[in-house]
């Protein structure tokens, strides 16, 4: 293997810094002048500014555009932009690819550069979701409380009571029922959620989500790859993924999860035998997840405060609603607690 010269590394870094910053500026102009979205425009600007210190004079000096063989390489798709969405998608992909190159080759120059570009890449994933994400995903981002159901005879009544308490996000979870029963319950829950303008997701089963026209699906670590689920569900449905550690989080984000579950925070019978990830993982998610995430696992009204203190703003609940005698009141109280950080 030929040893790469410092000049070659410098040229790679220079080209990809240019590529990333140009792509971000293209996206920023749309956010600023067309959408007039201050938050998205500011994020683009901050990303550009975070890259600027790494674009040092020696990298610029290594540039050799006249002799760069890549300047003559073109693809027919480069000249085609069917609409603004396609333009934005192309530039965001360009930025993500450039940041990956900077992450890898930057390590050869300065490990801190590689680490910085890795975090910036995750932020671009979040920017892409906020800019191009479906209306369903945008609604999910506004949900602070997420009910994951458990099997019971009065399932519909319990869920409706929670919806009456202000709940806006429900996941139907039943690992053991026969498919005919699961389909009927999922269909009934979907209709109920629509009456209350709440989102409805199905646990694990992409086929069931499709059969009842759910708003999306939540996948475990052993379920279908996100890319396969996306191909089946289409671009607008919500796809979530359970994660229990930083490695699973990074993989889910890279694969395109719209949101992730972070936990189990505490021991819970719904994850029997699973060691709790603890509040440490919640704290990790605060600074490392660019996509929406819900703390999950053994959370109730008594320990919600410390989960919030660890940085969680969105939580998923099972027993604290499903097993209470007054789901409406329990839901309202949980939402009141969460409203202290989600005014």
UniProtKB/Swiss-Prot annotation:
Binding, 4-amino-2-methyl-5-(diphosphooxymethyl)pyrimidine: 171-175, 203, 242, 271
Source species, domain of life: Bacteria
Chain positions recorded as 2-[(2R,5Z)-2-carboxy-4-methylthiazol-5(2H)-ylidene]ethyl phosphate binding sites: 268-270, 298
Region (Unknown): 1-123
Region Thiamine-phosphate synthase, residue ranges: 124-343
Record has Nucleus as a keyword: no
Binding site for Mg(2+): 204, 223
InterPro entries (UniProt xref): Aldolase_TIM, ThiamineP_synth_sf, ThiamineP_synth_TenI, ThiD2, TMP_synthase, TMP_synthase_cyanobac_bac
Cofactor comment: Binds 1 Mg(2+) ion per subunit.
Cellular compartments per GO CC: cytosol
Pathway it works in: Cofactor biosynthesis; thiamine diphosphate biosynthesis; thiamine phosphate from 4-amino-2-methyl-5-diphosphomethylpyrimidine and 4-methyl-5-(2-phosphoethyl)-thiazole: step 1/1
One GO term (biological process): thiamine biosynthetic process
GO molecular function, one term: thiamine-phosphate diphosphorylase activity
Cofactor: Mg(2+)
Coiled-coil ranges per UniProt: none
Homology family: Belongs to the thiamine-phosphate synthase family.
Reported function: Condenses 4-methyl-5-(beta-hydroxyethyl)thiazole monophosphate (THZ-P) and 2-methyl-4-amino-5-hydroxymethyl pyrimidine pyrophosphate (HMP-PP) to form thiamine monophosphate (TMP).
Protein name according to UniProt: Thiamine-phosphate synthase
